[in-house]
């Protein structure tokens, strides 16, 4: 996604939560023990091994800004978040059964006249027993009013009677909170983010979107406004990936970020970069989470051949929080780790390559061009023009980027490499240019010519190839492009002839 915003409202009772353990104001107790989650299917290739997906990558705005600009204007507390919490990702197989009844619920399976024909009843409400056929409503107002009522299958008035004994009678609330809950017992009503009532009450953006994900009434046929007030044109459906089956399998890799004030530093929490805006009021952090190194594994999952879902949830938050994301993406690469041993022969012990030895990523002019006193900015290599995107009305330069390799504990005489398969005919090419930047990891000391970079190209990786090796100078922030080579291909052929 290009950009998104998520409100972690740890006090608010969310959709289809009938836990009666509420405060007198109708809020959830013990917010740190609660969680809020969103799930979506992986809509493109689910074989992460084939596509070589290596990272979950995104930019996040600092959620712990001081002062007025950092207040979470949720309409209840309107305070800054000062305590932090956990942001957790699940990749793999995640249950689609939102209502936990092993029945495939979809709104357009409900009776168009609100009768009980083809309906089953359980602790969650009314659910269809029909076979799922199409993802469209019947196109008339009466049917829409009787089907667009959420996954509980109940209209607001019927929710009160249905959950009276197991939920409402157990509540001890103020009159205001009681009235609010009785108006929408399942907390699933949709509210569009524009409206005269919102304008009159001067509602801020978080309050405007607070009920935008509601499932009841989010697909009206008509509207009394001069804009479309739909949340979605399609019926709600538990089948997220639309494969006509309801999966309740839970087997996934889990990745945890512990977000706390004072811990948002490069090198911690998978933070690899940060940008401070020109006004100095906000900081954006770039996260790059290596998916091959999960924090935990749940269930029976052993590879990345079928990654069908991603689930994101917040927990351990004592206070409401807003997380603002930009460029949330799964990052793959044409380059793959070279797993064969490159250790120089001799009497030394041969080490085994591990995932922690090397990380593959990219740096780009649009995301990594701001440096600091201790960090070099990324710049376009000299003589390399940025491509122009001619497919848009306004011509723009594309994002120029380069391969980045990060090494840990690279021992003397050892080498690590990446490779990609290609089919180049170099007969009409004259030269090979390489531009290389080298810098030590934080806290490490690295001297000029202590490491080298090498390029191999040929018909295979072990016996039939040309190799160019370049000892590296450590790049200083004020002196860029200190390493590079510009070699004529004809010279490589001459050197090869002399060698043999």
Where are these regions (language model features)?
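Low-complexity, serine/threonine/proline-enriched polar segments
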Residues: 107-257, 360-371, 375-376, 475-492, ...
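Extracellular/lumenal carbohydrate-interaction signature centered on repeated Trp-anchored short motifs
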Residues: 45-54, 276-281, 303, 421-432
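Extended intrinsically disordered, low-complexity coil regions enriched in Ser, Thr, Gly, Ala
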Residues: 318-343, 440-480
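Short carbohydrate-recognition loop motifs
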Residues: 5-34, 389-413
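Extracellular beta-strand ligand-recognition surfaces/modules
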Residues: 53-57, 84-94, 121-123, 133-136, ...
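Extended, low-complexity, turn-rich repeat/linker tracts enriched in Gly/Pro/Ser/Thr and Asp/Glu
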Residues: 62-69, 77-83, 320, 426, ...
């Amino acid at each position: 996604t290009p950009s998104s915003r998520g409100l972690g409202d740890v006090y608010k009772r969310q959709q289809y939560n009938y836990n009666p353990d509420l405060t007198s104001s109708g809020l959830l107790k013990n917010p740190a023990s609660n969680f809020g989650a969103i799930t979506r299917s992986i809509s493109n290739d689910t074989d992460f091994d084939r596509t070589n997906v290596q990272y979950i990558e995104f930019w996040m705005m600092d959620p712990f800004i001081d002062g007025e600009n950092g207040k979470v204007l949720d309409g209840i507390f309107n305070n800054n978040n000062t305590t932090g919490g956990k942001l957790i990702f699940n990749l793999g197989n995640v249950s689609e059964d939102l209502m936990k009844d092993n029945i495939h619920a979809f709104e357009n399976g409900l009776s168009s006249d609100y009768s009980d024909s083809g309906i089953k009843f359980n602790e969650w409400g009314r659910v269809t027993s029909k076979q799922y056929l199409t993802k469209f409503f019947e196109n008339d107002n009466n049917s829409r009013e009787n089907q667009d009522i959420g996954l509980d299958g109940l209209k607001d008035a019927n929710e009160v009677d249905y959950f009276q004994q197991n939920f409402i009678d157990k509540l001890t609330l103020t009159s205001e909170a009681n009235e609010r809950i009785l108006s929408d017992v399942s907390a699933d009503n949709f509210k569009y983010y524009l409206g005269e009532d919102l304008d009159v009450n001067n509602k801020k953006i978080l309050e405007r979107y607070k009920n935008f994900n509601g499932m009841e009434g989010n697909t009206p046929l008509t509207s009394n406004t001069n804009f479309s007030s739909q949340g979605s044109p399609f019926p709600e459906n538990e089948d997220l990936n639309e494969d006509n089956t309801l999966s309740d399998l839970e087997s996934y890799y889990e990745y945890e970020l512990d977000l706390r004030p004072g811990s948002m530093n490069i090198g911690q929490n998978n933070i690899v970069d940060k940008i401070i805006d020109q006004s100095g009021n906000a900081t954006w952090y770039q996260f790059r989470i290596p998916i091959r190194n999960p924090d935990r594994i749940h269930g029976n999952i052993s590879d990345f051949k079928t990654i069908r879902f991603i689930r994101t949830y917040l927990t351990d938050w004592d206070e409401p929080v807003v997380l603002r994301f930009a460029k949330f993406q799964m990052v793959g690469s044409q380059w793959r780790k070279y797993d064969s041993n490159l250790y120089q022969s001799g009497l030394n012990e041969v080490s085994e390559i591990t995932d922690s030895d090397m990380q593959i990523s990219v740096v780009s002019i649009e995301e990594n061009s701001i440096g600091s006193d201790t960090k070099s900015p990324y710049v376009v290599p000299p003589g390399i023009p940025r491509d122009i995107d001619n497919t848009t009305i306004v011509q723009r330069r594309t994002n120029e980027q380069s391969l980045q390799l990060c090494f840990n504990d690279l021992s003397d005489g050892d080498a690590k490499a990446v490779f990609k398969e290609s089919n180049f005919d170099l007969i009409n090419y004259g030269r090979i240019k390489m531009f290389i930047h080298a810098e030590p990891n934080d806290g490490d000391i690295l001297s000029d010519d202590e490491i080298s970079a090498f390029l191999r190209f040929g018909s295979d990786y072990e016996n039939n190839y040309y190799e160019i090796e370049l000892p590296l100078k450590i790049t200083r922030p004020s002196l860029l492009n200190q390493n590079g080579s510009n070699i004529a291909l004809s010279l490589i052929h001459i050197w090869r002839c002399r060698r043999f």
